[in-house]
């Protein structure tokens, strides 16, 4: 991996002597890079969704992809207009500033990707539920199909929260694994919603009940 310090993001968050692991994780150790990672995961998940739903009705697959693409385009416009990770510096600096030492931690390095897998997995569930609602397909069969996405998103979000809590405990010295601040609460709210959805999906699959709650 080359250290191209003509890129503003690389200059601000990397250094030529930094270990390869932290050069890679430094990509999402900032606002611009984290949004780029978000878009990457969004694109990866829609690709996986299309591979896994070949036996699903064509209209459902197309409509879900359309809703998902709207989300992707929205984030892409926001990325380029306000958080462009591809800004250049001229003349090119000889060395970068390096990543914040607090962020150079194995737990925190893998924390954002895992957390994003949970967040972005929820977008697939959202797009799928919109499609199923439009096509009047919120039923037991749909619940069986989408259940794996709900469960996977819940697992990734749980792991992401745990990793973030462990890192905060021994790095920030808060004296505990949890602190009621917006950074942590913003991941707790989707986790609670996914936990509720998981229970509702199981009820819908087995008893054909709670259809409205699943959509909400």
Which functions belong to the PLM regions below?
Residues 1-216:
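Polytopic transmembrane helical bundles with strong interfacial aromatic enrichment
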């Amino acid at each position: 991996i080359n250290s191209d310090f003509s890129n503003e993001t690389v200059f601000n968050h990397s250094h030529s002597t930094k270990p390869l692991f932290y050069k890679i994780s430094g990509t999402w150790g900032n606002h611009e890079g984290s949004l780029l990672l978000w878009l990457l995961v969004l694109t990866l998940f829609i690709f996986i969704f299309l591979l896994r739903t070949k036996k699903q009705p064509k209209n459902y697959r197309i409509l879900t992809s359309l809703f998902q693409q709207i989300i992707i385009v929205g984030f892409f416009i926001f990325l380029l207009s306000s958080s462009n990770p591809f800004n250049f510096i001229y003349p090119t600096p000889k060395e970068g500033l390096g990543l914040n030492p607090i962020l150079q931690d194995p737990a925190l390095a893998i924390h954002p990707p895992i957390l994003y897998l949970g967040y972005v997995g929820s977008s697939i569930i959202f797009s799928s539920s919109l499609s199923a609602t439009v096509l009047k397909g919120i039923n037991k069969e749909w619940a069986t199909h989408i259940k794996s996405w709900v469960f996977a998103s819940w697992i990734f979000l749980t792991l992401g929260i745990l990793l973030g809590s462990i890192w905060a405990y021994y790095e920030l010295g808060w004296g505990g694994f949890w602190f009621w601040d917006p950074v942590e609460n913003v991941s707790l709210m989707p986790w609670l919603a996914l936990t509720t959805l998981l229970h509702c999906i199981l009820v819908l699959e087995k008893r054909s009940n709670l259809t409205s709650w699943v959509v909400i």
